[in-house]
Amino acid sequence: MTIIVTGGAGFIGSNFVFHMLNKYPDYRIICLDKLTYAGNLSTLAPVMDNPNFRFVKADICDRDAVYQLFEEEHPDMVVNFAAESHVDRSIENPGIFLETNIMGTSVLMDACRKYGIKRYHQASSDEVYGDLPLDRPDLFFTEETPIHTSSPYSSSKAAADLLVLAYHRTYGLPVSISRCSNNYGPYHFPEKLIPLM
């Protein structure tokens, strides 16, 4: 099994890489990361010498680079953690969020179609559901909660999710989407809540 993990030098992606290499030592894990402000190549130092790991510095928006990697590695699966992910940054510069989170996902989906990927997983965000009223502690989000975005970041993630679902419905591409809430743990980026405390 060969898995391309995009955004694998970031907080969640790197933890996923470590987990997969530990639990499935025979799997080949290919990490594709642009190494933006939130990517940290030194995080992956413990696995750099693993013969079943490969790091590729590339942008998911670069169609030629993505297709070349698919051509070289013939992946079975893609897990997309690559994203611009800070709400405040999305307010300052929404364009980069639209480019990476929507157009980058489009490039990955097209590559998955072309190369016959067995599974594509989109790591999304609970931000796509919007905000709950502070005076209603009895309310909570479920998988049936409608999308109700409230920032350029959440809108870009929701658009990517809808694109993934459209590729499933239109082309039969096997997909899954997870919408996790705030994560914390090893390799967390310093601007996030827990490291700031």
Language-model-detected regions and their locations in the chain:
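Substrate-binding strand-loop-helix patch
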Residues: 184-191
